[in-house]
């Protein structure tokens, strides 16, 4: 009975409302004299229902209801004051709840125009009806934010001054001026209105309303501050406020509220004052007035006092934003932003950044612009476009010309000219008649795969030298060599290396074997001597004698050192024979194979007779210390390096522990920014001493024991200048790429002289990208020499309090592509060292030098089975710096020299791989190392892969850039991966000849089945691929194209799909097959479009880690990168089997691959260039990369905190119209 009663009541209420609205509509139509009373009565009844029944509100604003039209029509036509008041009250009730939807309905029905006209009519009355004005402004304030054109409408109707005059005339009538101020705030969002109101004295008026702390009228104070903040965004109004001294007044008001609001009840008012200061400091005059009023110190002190209260974070963040904005722009402390190293180009480009740099007058200051801080441009509107194009314009980058998208195979060079590349394909003409080939597959060459320990190779004099003999054919090693056969028999399989535990278990066996293989090595003590001079590896009789008999100790003024006898063999150190010192002089760092004792420990060691032996663990089977030194001697660098970095000498093995993605501590960014601001406030605390400087040859290492020593004068090193800021804090400046004035990202340097238990802060202050994975859990890498000597030679992720943010160092327009007002960014991290006086190396990512590549290739060549593997290393060309660019050919030897086997050998499809076109993307080399080692392994699947394909591999397309520590360019100062369309043989020889190889294959009708260029990605996680597709590119545009133009073989998706199922680090959801205009000159697009390779890819490996799969939540290491290289090979084998239906049954999951549509096409329009929105979750602490955020909500963390999950895009939608996959 109760339910029935409620239902009856509801129906009656609904019918009652409809009846009243019908009566009101009839009154509007009749317009009979005397109907005013009826309208007054009906509207009063409706108002009562609306105030008492929520259901009535929903019914009147529901879709299909004409209630709003009827009420607005009545409001527009009636002249009865009470009816108008009733209707206004009804509308206020309707829009007071229900979010913004109801207000939007009112706007779409024309409510704004009616209200403004009513306001104009009411203003003509004298005096105006106060109640009417209150209701009108209250309603306008509620619907105004939903009407984007309300500012223009108000100005045209003349409503601006009506509201302003009401405030001026009723300053004591808080009930009236409160809604008027709310409307003025809405009006002020229009810049023209803000200027107009400013001319009429609105700024001065606001400062009459706001004032020091008071518990009275706090609502009015808050609204007045919000209105003032909006008005001051106008440069004209901001100047007016500065001229009248209001900046000092705002600071005084803020301090007063800060002191008295001890219970933090008025945080919004305090934030409102800060928003006004934030607006006025958008102009230079405002920033100057802020500094003159001691604003930096005031906000710094108040924000420090707010740190303890989490709810006051919006005040701290807004204060930080203002201080960063007002921090004086500093000049980067460099004489020029051009590289410290100079290389004269053989040909100067006709246009482009390099040409502009060469054409600059010698007296031009390229570090900072004279007008850097002179413009009054509103810095709030600055668009971040470093490195990538702004996302607002990314649609323009997608290629929409269907004719350009269609692959067009064209040689580009005469066939006669391309014949020069025939020499790089001897496998197509080799008859193998002189080889002892058996007709059956030989047994695996590795007979003792469980034996750990080092790999012994021929001496350096017997091994391959790229400079003297660039071409090596795999069959040159003869089976009759008994020493070589013995070496093969004891070599472990590449992919079957024993784990550390099994190595320990067989330590006795290892010792017995190694004592027969290795001479005594030089031992090292636990303590490292501070200031020990670097050891010169020169061919002197003294050195030869020491290294032949035992340990050598180098004396200096501070330390008394004596030779130490080795108590046992260092099992894992390669012999330092006399060949190490032949040829040019090469220096190691502060450690070599020497015994070193400090003065304090010397007496103890002598008296006790105890000697501590430090061992270097067994590293990669293709690493050899001696051979590395030999390779260094043939490497040519522009600075003519004579030192060798210890990580490259000792080698690296992955640490045995997992390295999770670092969880960012809350508030770390603002803490670092506060410390930066302290430099201005407490200038006397700043040391500001240069401790390392490539530009100043006379700048020697500091003598003080408490000062760190730095060095980067070794292969791939990059560190230009170091300035000590505080006792344990250093600013580091990176070197530009040679013949360039930017690309600051890669770093690799040495640090020594540290103490334990101290947190050292390092700030790399001239980074250029607007964001970094350092904000999302990535850590820099450190290599400890002491740890390496303690059998732990590993690069490990280190650092706490890591963040990446915009700093106060100006970036000149010359270095920013013509854009003025740009700033650099800072990577900051803190490290506490484990060992006193250690020598440590820091790097952006795992270093992999050109000399390391040469060593690895030579080791692979010397260790392979020539009867099983066809291996050839050639010199593709010579680089600008005089270094050889190696190209490697790998396949399986033919089963025999019979015609059928030779024919099968020659007709294997080609796979063309390349890597390291960008020197800073070292992870690409580690992936390539995994690929090479897998291809050269005795794994049965590797043998099957070799029998399936011929691999042409250019493992390092940019040797010069790698050697000289560049991040992106070669010695030409240009990004080589943007030169594939028209490479210059003089400036881009590696690209010119790599493209020539592919053009030659196209000319002889031997197109590679797959081309893949290995890269690294600094802005995204996981490993993924970029490919090329006409259909997917067009799907991302609004261009209508005939379906016949979009017909293409979807086989380009097969390999990425295979990798997503086989490689743990690979993520299909991050792959993209869109072709952009900005990428038309890259290898991927040119090889697809011009050469005609459908499966043309760029494989991107994260620098950070993974957020999916087996490695979710972990930072990526060399083990995972090498695994990816091996898994890529496995994917190629599966691809081959899929292309041969008789040989392999297709998995059902891959059969329908051609039916997949583009995922997330509505959101991602250019994913190869831009970071996806869902790539990273939001922080609990809002990350402010820029010092000039334009978001009014930037500090309101309480409203923004929430769990945010990245939307994993699924790759499984179907397209019924797509063609079936062509497996060929």
UniProtKB/Swiss-Prot annotation:
GO terms for biological process: C-terminal protein deglutamylation; cerebellar Purkinje cell differentiation; eye photoreceptor cell differentiation; mitochondrion organization; neuromuscular process; olfactory bulb development; protein side chain deglutamylation; proteolysis. Keywords: Carboxypeptidase, Cytoplasm, Hydrolase, Metal-binding, Metalloprotease, Mitochondrion, Nucleus, Protease, Zinc. Binds 1 zinc ion per subunit. Its EC number is 3.4.17.-, 3.4.17.24. GO terms for molecular function: metallocarboxypeptidase activity; tubulin binding; zinc ion binding. Gene3D superfamilies: 2.60.40.3120, Leucine-rich Repeat Variant, Zn peptidases. The active site is at 1100 (proton donor/acceptor). Residues 846-1136 form the Peptidase M14 domain. Zn(2+) binds at residues 918, 921, 1015. Residues 361-398, 1186-1224 are annotated as: Disordered. Its main location: cytoplasm. It is found in: Cytoplasm; Cytoplasm, Cytosol; Nucleus; Mitochondrion. Residues 1206-1224 have a biased composition (Polar residues). Metallocarboxypeptidase that mediates protein deglutamylation of tubulin and non-tubulin target proteins. Catalyzes the removal of polyglutamate side chains present on the gamma-carboxyl group of glutamate residues within the C-terminal tail of alpha- and beta-tubulin. Specifically cleaves tubulin long-side-chains, while it is not able to remove the branching point glutamate. Also catalyzes the removal of polyglutamate residues from the carboxy-terminus of alpha-tubulin as well as non-tubulin proteins. Belongs to the peptidase M14 family. This is Cytosolic carboxypeptidase 1. It comes from Gallus gallus. The gene is AGTPBP1.
């Amino acid at each position: 009975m109760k339910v029935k009663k409620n239902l009856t009541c509801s129906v009656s209420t609904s019918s009652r409302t409809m009846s009243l609205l019908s009566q009101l509509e009839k009154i509007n139509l009749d317009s009979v004299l005397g109907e005013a009373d009826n309208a007054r009565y009906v509207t009063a009844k409706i108002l009562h229902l609306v105030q008492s029944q929520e259901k009535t509100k929903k019914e009147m604003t529901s879709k299909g209801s004409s209630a709003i039209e009827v009420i607005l029509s009545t409001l527009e036509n009636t002249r009865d004051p009470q009816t108008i008041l009733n209707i206004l009250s009804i509308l206020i009730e309707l829009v007071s709840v229900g979010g913004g939807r109801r207000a939007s309905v009112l706007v779409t029905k024309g409510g704004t125009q009616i209200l403004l006209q009513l306001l104009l009519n009411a203003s003509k009355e004298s005096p105006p009806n106060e109640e009417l004005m209150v209701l009108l402004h209250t309603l306008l304030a509620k619907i105004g934010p939903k009407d984007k054109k309300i500012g223009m409408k108000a100005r045209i109707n003349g409503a601006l001054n009506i509201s302003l005059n009401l405030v001026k005339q009723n300053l004591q009538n808080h009930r009236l001026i409160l809604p008027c101020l709310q409307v003025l705030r809405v009006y002020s969002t229009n810049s023209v209105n803000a200027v107009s109101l400013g001319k009429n004295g609105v700024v001065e008026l606001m400062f009459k309303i706001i004032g020091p702390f008071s518990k009275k009228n706090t609502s009015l104070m808050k609204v007045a501050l919000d209105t003032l903040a909006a008005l001051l965004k106008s440069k004209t109004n901001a100047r007016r406020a500065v001229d009248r001294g209001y900046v000092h007044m705002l600071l005084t008001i803020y301090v007063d509220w800060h002191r008295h609001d001890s219970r933090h009840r008025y945080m919004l008012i305090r934030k409102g004052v800060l928003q006004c200061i934030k607006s006025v400091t958008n102009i230079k005059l405002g920033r100057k007035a802020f500094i003159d009023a001691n604003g930096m110190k005031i906000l710094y002190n108040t924000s420090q006092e707010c740190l303890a209260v989490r709810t006051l974070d919006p005040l701290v963040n807004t204060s930080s934003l203002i201080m960063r904005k007002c921090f004086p722009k500093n000049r980067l402390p460099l004489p020029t932003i051009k590289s410290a190293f100079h290389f004269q180009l053989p040909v100067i480009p006709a246009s482009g950044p390099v040409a502009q740099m060469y054409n600059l007058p010698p007296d031009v200051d390229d570090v900072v612009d004279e007008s850097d801080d002179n413009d009054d441009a509103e810095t709030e509107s600055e668009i971040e476009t470093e490195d990538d194009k702004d996302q607002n314009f990314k649609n323009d980058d997608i290629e929409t010309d269907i004719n350009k998208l269609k692959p067009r195979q064209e040689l580009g060079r005469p066939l006669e000219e391309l014949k020069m590349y025939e020499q790089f394909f001897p496998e197509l003409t080799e008859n193998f008649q002189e080889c002892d080939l058996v007709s059956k597959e030989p047994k695996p060459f590795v007979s003792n795969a469980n034996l750990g320990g080092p790999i012994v190779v021929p001496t350096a004099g017997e091994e391959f030298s790229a400079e003297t003999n660039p071409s090596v054919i795999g069959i040159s090693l003869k089976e009759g060599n008994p020493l070589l056969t013995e070496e093969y028999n004891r070599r472990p399989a590449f992919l079957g290396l024993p784990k550390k535990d099994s190595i320990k278990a067989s330590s006795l066996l290892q010792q017995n074997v190694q004592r027969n293989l290795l001479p005594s090595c030089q031992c090292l003590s636990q303590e490292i001597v501070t200031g020990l001079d670097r050891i010169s590896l020169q061919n002197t009789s003294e050195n030869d004698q020491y290294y032949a008999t035992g340990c050598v100790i180098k004396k200096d003024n501070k330390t008394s050192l004596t030779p130490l006898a080795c108590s046992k063999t260092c099992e894992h150190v390669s012999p330092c024979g006399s060949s190490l010192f032949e040829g040019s002089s090469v220096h190691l760092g502060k450690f070599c194979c020497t015994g070193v004792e400090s003065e304090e420990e010397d007496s103890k060691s002598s008296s006790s007779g105890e000697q501590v032996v430090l061992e270097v663990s067994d590293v990669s089977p293709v690493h050899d210390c001696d051979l590395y030194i030999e390779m260094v001697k043939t490497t040519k660098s522009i600075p003519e390096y004579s030192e060798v970095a210890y990580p490259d000498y000792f080698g690296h093995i992955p640490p045995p522990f997992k390295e999770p993605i670092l969880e960012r501590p809350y508030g770390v960014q603002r803490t670092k920014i506060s410390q930066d601001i302290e430099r201005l406030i407490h200038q006397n605390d700043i040391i500001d001493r240069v401790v390392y400087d490539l530009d100043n040859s006379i700048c020697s290492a500091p003598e003080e024991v408490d000062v760190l020593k730095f060095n980067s004068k070794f292969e791939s090193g990059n560190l230009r200048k170091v300035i000590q800021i505080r006792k344990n804090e250093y600013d580091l400046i990176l070197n530009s790429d040679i013949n360039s004035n930017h690309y600051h990202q890669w770093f690799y340097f040495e640090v020594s002289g540290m103490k334990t238990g101290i947190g050292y802060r390092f700030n790399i202050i001239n980074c250029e990208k607007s964001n970094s994975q350092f904000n999302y859990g990535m850590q820099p890498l450190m290599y400890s020499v002491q740890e390496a000597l303690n059998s732990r030679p590993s690069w490990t992720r280190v650092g706490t309090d890591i963040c990446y943010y915009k700093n106060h160092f100006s970036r000149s327009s010359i270095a920013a592509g013509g854009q003025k007002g740009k700033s650099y960014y800072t990577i900051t991290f803190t490290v506490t060292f484990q060992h006193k006086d250690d020598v440590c190396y820091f790097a952006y990512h795992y270093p992999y030098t050109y000399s390391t590549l040469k060593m690895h290739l030579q080791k692979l060549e010397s260790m392979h089975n020539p009867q099983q593997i066809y291996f050839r290393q050639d010199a593709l060309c010579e680089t600008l710096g005089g270094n050889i660019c190696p190209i490697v050919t790998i396949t399986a030897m033919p089963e025999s020299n019979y015609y059928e086997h030779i024919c099968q050998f020659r007709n294997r499809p080609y796979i063309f791989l390349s890597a390291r076109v960008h020197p800073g993307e070292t992870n690409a080399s580690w992936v390539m190392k995994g690929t090479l080692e897998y291809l050269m392994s005795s794994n049965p699947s590797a043998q099957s892969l070799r029998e399936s394909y011929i691999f042409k591999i250019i493992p390092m397309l940019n040797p010069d850039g790698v050697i000289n520590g560049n991040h992106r360019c070669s010695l030409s100062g240009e990004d080589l991966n943007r030169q594939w369309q028209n490479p210059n043989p003089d400036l881009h020889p590696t690209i010119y000849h790599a493209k020539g190889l592919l053009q030659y294959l196209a000319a002889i009708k031997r197109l590679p089945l797959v081309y893949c260029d290995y890269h690294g990605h600094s802005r995204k996680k996981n490993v993924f691929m970029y490919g090329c597709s006409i259909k997917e590119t067009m799907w991302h545009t609004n261009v209508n194209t005939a379906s016949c133009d979009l017909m293409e073989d979807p086989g380009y998706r097969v390999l990425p799909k295979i990798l997503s199922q086989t490689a743990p680090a690979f993520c299909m959801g991050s792959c993209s097959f869109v072709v952009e205009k900005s990428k038309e000159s890259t290898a991927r697009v040119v090889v697809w479009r011009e050469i005609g390779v459908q499966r043309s890819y760029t494989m991107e490996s994260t620098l950070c880690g993974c957020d999916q799969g087996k490695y979710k939540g972990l930072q990526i290491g060399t083990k995972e990168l090498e695994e990816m290289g091996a898994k890529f090979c496995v994917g190629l084998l599966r691809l081959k089997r899929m292309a041969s239906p008789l040989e392999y049954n297709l998995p059902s999951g891959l059969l329908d691959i051609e039916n997949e549509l583009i995922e997330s096409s509505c959101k991602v329009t250019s994913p190869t260039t831009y970071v996806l929105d869902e790539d990273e979750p939001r922080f609990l602490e809002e990350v402010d990369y820029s010092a000039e955020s334009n978001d009014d909500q930037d500090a309101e963390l309480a409203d923004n905190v929430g769990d945010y999950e990245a939307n994993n895009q699924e790759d499984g939608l179907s397209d019924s119209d797509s063609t079936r996959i062509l497996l060929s």
